[in-house]
């Protein structure tokens, strides 16, 4: 998947055996759950809990990859990496990109499925 791809529909469809109904259910569950997950990231950033922040970013990275959200996956990876390095300031700068990529992915999913 090329860098910068917001939504890899072909990839997610292949992983779900080209079942569009299942793809809609999986992506809707992701869209419903991720805003809460991002709020948890925000809480960990505010408290400076880098260990939990790293785990939470890793979780979002994996969920994003499973629904074809390549740009969001990359943004979550950047936050995970910053947290692992102990760089709270860098992790905080990652939050707005992560939120922006989630919004872009949401629009792409809603217009594609």
Regions found by a protein language model. Give the residues of each.
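Two-component system phosphorelay core
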Residues: 1-113
């Amino acid at each position: 998947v090329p860098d910068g791809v917001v939504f890899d529909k072909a990839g997610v469809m292949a992983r779900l055996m080209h079942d569009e109904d299942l793809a809609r259910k999986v992506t809707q569950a992701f869209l419903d759950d991720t805003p809460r997950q991002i709020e948890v990231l925000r809480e960990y950033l505010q408290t400076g809990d880098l260990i939990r922040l790293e785990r939470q970013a890793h979780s979002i990275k994996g969920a994003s990859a499973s629904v074809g959200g390549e740009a969001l996956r990359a943004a979550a990876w950047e936050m995970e990496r910053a947290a692992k390095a102990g760089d709270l300031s860098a992790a905080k700068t990652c939050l707005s990109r992560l939120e922006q990529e989630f919004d872009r992915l949401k629009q792409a999913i809603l217009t594609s499925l």
